[in-house]
Amino acid sequence: MANSLRGEVLTLYKNLLYLGRDYPKGADYFKRRLKNVFLKNKDVEDPEKIKELIARGEFVMKELEALYFLRKYRAMKQRYYSDTKV
């Protein structure tokens, strides 16, 4: 694996690990799944395939950020708007 791709993969792993701290099923669950996925693909050497996997990881990262944003929004909405009808 080229050094530039290796750096991208490590950065992606660290970012996903950081985002996994607030995962709904728990940080340990997320960390275990993340490690398994990265270990499953550790033998991939084709640069194009590695770039595909990096793109998929970045997509997952964006989805997690959206999930956390929505969770915070829902909590805020529940605090300020009651569901009781007049």
Curated annotation (Swiss-Prot):
Predominant place of localization: mitochondrion
A GO MF label: enzyme inhibitor activity
Matches recorded under InterPro entries: Complex1_LYR_dom, Complex1_LYR_ETFRF1_LYRM5, ETFRF1
GO BP field: negative regulation of oxidative phosphorylation; respiratory electron transport chain
Signal peptide: none
Any one GO CC term of the record: mitochondrion
Short name of any one Pfam family annotated for the protein: Complex1_LYR
UniProtKB keywords: Mitochondrion
Localization (cell): Mitochondrion
UniProt similarity note: Belongs to the complex I LYR family.
Subunit relationships: homotetramer. Interacts with NDUFAB1. Interacts with ETFA. Interacts with ETFB.
Record function comment: Acts as a regulator of the electron transfer flavoprotein by promoting the removal of flavin from the ETF holoenzyme (composed of ETFA and ETFB).
Protein name as annotated: Electron transfer flavoprotein regulatory factor 1
Taxonomic classification: Eukaryota, Metazoa, Chordata, Craniata, Vertebrata
